[in-house]
Amino acid sequence: EDVIRDIMNEKGITGFENLPINLSICTVDTLTTDECIFTTKEENLENEHIHYITGAPLETAVRASMSFPAIYTTCPYDKYNFIDGGSKDNLPVKILRDMGVGKVLAIGFDIMTYNPDAGLGGLIKVIWRALDVYSIDGTRESKKMADLAIDIKNENTQLFSMDSVDETIQEGYDAIMAHKDEILKVFGEQNSAE
């Protein structure tokens, strides 16, 4: 959380309350297995197995959303013990719809493409693929609920490889630019800029 807080300080951000937009950050509580959504403002929503949390430190919410199982430790806060929200809902379109968001652009990595390998690399890939299996049906449904869904192809990128960060960013940019006309058609041109 200290690193996140330092970045926030550099940007002049003290918390949710002074962000230029409403922000929702998804995570999962390991104690209840419920989804938990950190929000900028009180949403007054009641959904079974979803907790809406306001008033939490922004750095805690960001840290909680990064708590990828077996890579980072969980993030304890209040009565919760958080892990990455993608563990349960890898494309939280329904959450946004429930919160009244008008149009939703769903952007995610292409998890439908899978090429098994032999050896240790293949073992690691199959472990990650097993995790995909748990959320893939939800991801499919989320794509249907979005106004537009875009897959980022990144088959050459290794999960958690810092050497691949620039390549992954470029692949994301390329995916968006390849769909630019469609995005502008669905969401309007009021904020178009390259």
Give, region by region, the residue ranges found by the protein language model.
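Patatin-like phospholipase
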Residues: 1-194
